Amino acid sequence: MSAEKSMNVSREFSVQQIHSFTLSEKTARYLAIKRVMDIWFALIGLAIALPMIAVFSILICLETPGPAIYTQERVGKGGKPFKLYKLRSMKIDAEKSGAVWAQKQDPRVTRIGAFIRRTRIDELPQLFNVLKGDMSMIGPRPERPVFTEKFQNEIPGFTQRLGSGERRLRYDAEGKADI
């Protein structure tokens, strides 16, 4: 009998209908709870991470001249740009020729930088971005404007994953957009 029910259900709904949703289905309560949790986890994370951020900031400044905290423009929710914070893992002039992704054994990456990238310690200052509301603990990774523009031309639905208001995006398309 359960096989008959599943057959009926599969005839009544298309896969696209089952795997799609609209942002308006998320309630204000859900978004408020998510924001409170972001603030809570960011505060706890910063309490734990600040000593590490301080130590690695000193090590970065001792190894190479320049600021320890690196800021980079990213595209956030609704396509709004913001400054993302990271511990600097590359030499100061690393992107003088333009925006490129780091490669394996990239000569622009410092010795301390290689370690903090491998251990993801370079990402700890992003807890300040979460606290400010620029980004969330859970959600799509904010990308650089140059790459966002490139991906929106190559990957259908890429910018919709940023939650720019009312939208419809299938789960499988959202997964591809995050890749």
Curated annotation (Swiss-Prot):
Pfam families: Bac_transf
Leftover remarks: The nature of the anionic polymer present in the cell wall of B.subtilis depends on phosphate availability. Under phosphate-replete growth conditions teichoic acids are present, whereas under phosphate-depleted conditions, at least part of the wall teichoic acid is replaced with teichuronic acid, a non-phosphate containing anionic polymer. The synthesis of teichuronic acid is accompanied by degradation of teichoic acid and reutilization of liberated phosphate for other cellular processes such as nucleic acid synthesis.
Similarity remark: Belongs to the bacterial sugar transferase family.
GO BP terms in the entry: cell wall organization; teichuronic acid biosynthetic process
Positions of transmembrane segments: 39-59
Name of the protein in question: Putative undecaprenyl-phosphate N-acetylgalactosaminyl 1-phosphate transferase
Catalysed reactions, as listed in the record: di-trans,octa-cis-undecaprenyl phosphate + UDP-N-acetyl-alpha-D-galactosamine = N-acetyl-alpha-D-galactosaminyl-di-trans,octa-cis-undecaprenyl diphosphate + UMP
InterPro entries: Bact_transf
EC number from the UniProt entry: 2.7.8.40
Predominant cellular place of this UniProt entry's protein: membrane
Entry GO terms, CC: plasma membrane
Induction: By phosphate starvation, via the PhoP/PhoR two-component regulatory system.
Keywords assigned: Cell membrane, Cell wall biogenesis/degradation, Glycosyltransferase, Membrane, Stress response, Transferase, Transmembrane, Transmembrane helix
Membrane topology of this protein: Single-pass membrane protein
Subcellular location(s) per record: Cell membrane
Pathway per the UniProt entry: Cell wall biogenesis; teichuronic acid biosynthesis
